[in-house]
Structure formats: C-alpha cells, structure tokens
C-alpha cells in the first residue's frame, strides 16, 4: 500500500492600468506543505493514518494570496496583499489534537522607494491570524524596515 500526493498551482500578474498591477497565486493539493509558507515547518506533508496502524497518509491543504500594487512614480510603489493557508483534517488527523494549526491568514501593506539603481528602502506592516482546530484564534503584528544596497 502506498499513498501519493499531488499539487495544483496557478499564479498571475497583470497590469490593470499603467500604474495598477494585480497579482496572485493559488495552491491546492495533498502532501504539499513544504510549498506553503505557514505549513512548511509543521511536517504535515505525510502523517500517520490513525485508521490504519503503521500506514501514512497525505493531508489536503490550500494556500492562496491576492494583492494589488500601485506605482506612484517609476521608482516608488505601494502594495497590499491578503493571504490564507488552510490545513484540512483527514481520518481525524490532526483535528484530534485541538491545538493543531488549522488555518492562517495575513494582511500586509508596504511601500518601497528605489532611491538609485543600487539602493532601495522600504517599510512594511503585517498583521497575521492563526486559528487552531479548536477554533482558538491568535494574532500578531509586525513592522519591517529595509535598507538595501546592491554592489
């Protein structure tokens, strides 16, 4: 007996106008946790099958994001993105552990300025939410700043 994972992925980016861009990505599959940001460190690609002792199973999971970018001028832009990652239970795994990760969401807004062709500065705010299988919510906020110089 063996089990097989699979994954589907679609992504896009397109210009709505000269200044507005839309971008996004969608992923769905079984055993694709290493390809999804929130799930990549949870070791859920292949897990025990509680209904079949000594056997393994692959769990269904989903991840997507969508964003919008506005180019203020050729060297300054702002953007916002919403993302969701979701782990589904199969054969009561991992839902039999009420504190196991169920889904995560985040919203991020940022601004970047390409000061020169070699130097970029930016600022970003991120708000993240996590919900476990017991529906217990958690959240966190983060502020990032960047100064990058390429030699």
Label for each model-derived stretch:
Residues 113-115, 139-151:
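Outer-membrane beta-barrel "beta-signal"
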Residues 24, 66, 80, 109-111, ...:
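Membrane-embedded beta-strand positions of outer-membrane beta-barrel proteins
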Residues 101, 132-137:
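Solvent-exposed loop/turn segments connecting transmembrane beta-strands
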Residues 21, 77, 120, 140-144:
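Outer-membrane beta-barrel architecture
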Residues 1-97, 101:
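Detector for outer-membrane/organellar transmembrane beta-barrel domains
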Residues 104-106:
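A short, acidic, amphipathic alpha-helical segment used as a generic capping/interface helix at domain edges
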């Amino acid at each position: 007996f063996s089990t097989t994972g699979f994954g589907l992925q679609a992504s896009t980016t397109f210009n709505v106008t000269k200044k507005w861009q839309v971008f996004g990505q969608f992923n769905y599959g079984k055993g694709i946790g290493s390809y999804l940001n929130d799930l990549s460190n949870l070791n859920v690609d292949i897990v025990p099958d509680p209904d079949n002792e000594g056997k393994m199973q692959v769990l269904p999971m989903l991840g997507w994001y969508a964003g919008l970018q506005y180019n203020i001028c050729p060297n300054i832009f702002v953007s916002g993105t919403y993302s969701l990652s979701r782990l589904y239970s199969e054969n009561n795994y991992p839902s039999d552990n009420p504190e196991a990760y169920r889904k995560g969401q985040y919203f991020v807004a940022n601004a970047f300025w390409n000061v020169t062709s070699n130097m970029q500065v930016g600022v970003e705010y991120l708000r993240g939410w996590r919900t476990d299988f017991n529906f217990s919510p958690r959240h966190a906020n983060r502020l990032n700043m960047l100064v990058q110089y390429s030699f």
